[in-house]
Amino acid sequence: MPQTKGKPHEEQLEQYKNSQTKPFVLTTSNGAPIFNKKASLTVGPRGPLLLQDVVFLDEMAHFDRERIPERVVHAKGGGAHGFFEVTDDITKYCKADVFSTIGKRTPIFIRFSTVGGELGSADTQRDPRGFAIKFYTEEGNWDLVGNNTPIFFIRDPIFFPNFIHTQKRNPVTHLKDPNMMWDFFSLRPETTHQVMILFGDRGIPDGFRHMDGFGSHTFKLVNKDGNAVYCKFHIKTAQGIRNLPPDVAIKLAGEDPDYSIRDLYDSIENGNYPVWRLMIQVMTFEEAANYRFNPFDITKVWSHKEFPLILVGKIVLNKNPTNYFAEVEQIAFAPSHVVPGIEFSPDKMLQGRLFAYPDTQFHRLGPNYVQLPINCPYRSRAHNTQRDGCFALDYNQGGMPTYHPNSFNGAIERTDVKESAWSVSGDVDRFNGDDEDNFSQPRDLWLKVMDETERARLVDNIADSLKYCKAFIQERAINNFTQVHQDFGNALRNALQKANEAMQKKREEEAEFNAKESVMMPCAIDDRMKNISNLAKYCKY
């Protein structure tokens, strides 16, 4: 029967078929041709397998090892290749080669993701989205490892494993547990700002193309004269912001759980390349020292009025991965991967991630993960004293000396890439930061950014989640949101009361139904026992 051409993701196999003039010869992993891959080697047609069936053993042994550890966060994602092009000059702030000339293009790969879900989870969950960019620059790979929100839930990395545990499954029931999540949120009021964004309209983006990205952290830019400023990175979508209503997101989770991945793939295959603008905010060291709050606190944003956005360039995604596992799954990002001209700030969360991200890549992919094609700095080959280890994929740096310094033409230092000097002082202690202002910016979000309908949807979304929690957790959450604004707390209390009443009614109806079933159950059991008894009498003959 004649068929119309399907969507791009439906035509992948047909595209591959058309790209080949003839099939390859089927081989084992060591490249030997295979005579028959449709039957195992056995003694007779019904006999046992032979241990010398190396074709089967080769296939099965590799299959047993196909899966690698999934990311502990950001497990589910999609991505694509593209380029970054400089459109505006920022060399007065930054000497990085990637920004050196207007019109300069740098290859990139972006991986988008959800945060808390597993590899098979739905793309349309209410969850922050990862927005990680790898720039393959001529001075090494630069990873801008961001999210789709300008802030984060916590400001001290000591809480990160605990926070993520609340987003994962209960260790006993293996179910998502709202009590865990809201217990943590309500005990740590610094989460309030991000929680309001998460449960607002932007908590469920309409795919990956219609959301912004943010470096979130404060970084440091250094120019060729050694002068430094603090910086925040913004990636603004040119497609316009679009979000999904909760009911649509829930429907898609069942009908099209890979909605965002499919949308990105089909868009690029159709030539509808998504575009973003890379922008920065800049703050001087003097401004940072005298600012009204800690500018390195990732739970807060910098005022756009005081620190306006500066355009840097555009980002375009124009090529889908040739293999999902090799590229999207094996790509490894780390905020510690920076290039000359881009440095770190005292941001505590950033400092914590400098260790955590490379460490988790070592766990997932091994010590030589940077040698994988998707991760290697192919425009600036690595020369160092690191050798050997599992999966040393390239030439292992040949005969170059494995120590430094040396007298035998080994790799040498480059004197013009010295990091900027900066001063720190203070007592060594564990500063808990509980006295930070956790509610002023959430109040601005409530009063100045959200309109009346957005505030109403925020309240309903929070109530819909909180209704599953213990009463004392609900009360503590209401208290936090009341500190944002009295109207917020009052509205949430009213919405939660209605949600609780509806929940109680539903549970009473379920209990009544279960009680009726339990009354009928003994009769059914008696009937089955009589049948078994009669069957036993029959079988004895």
Curated annotation (Swiss-Prot):
Its cofactor is heme. This is Catalase. The active site is at residues 74, 147. It catalyses: 2 H2O2 = O2 + 2 H2O. Pfam families: Catalase, Catalase-rel. Belongs to the catalase family. SUPFAM superfamilies: Heme-dependent catalase-like (SSF56634). Keywords: Heme, Hydrogen peroxide, Iron, Metal-binding, Oxidoreductase, Peroxidase, Peroxisome. Catalyzes the degradation of hydrogen peroxide (H(2)O(2)) generated by peroxisomal oxidases to water and oxygen, thereby protecting cells from the toxic effects of hydrogen peroxide. Residues 1-20 are annotated as: Disordered. GO terms for molecular function: catalase activity; heme binding; metal ion binding. PROSITE patterns: CATALASE_1, CATALASE_2, CATALASE_3. Heme binds at residue 357. Its EC number is 1.11.1.6. GO terms for cellular component: mitochondrion; peroxisomal matrix.
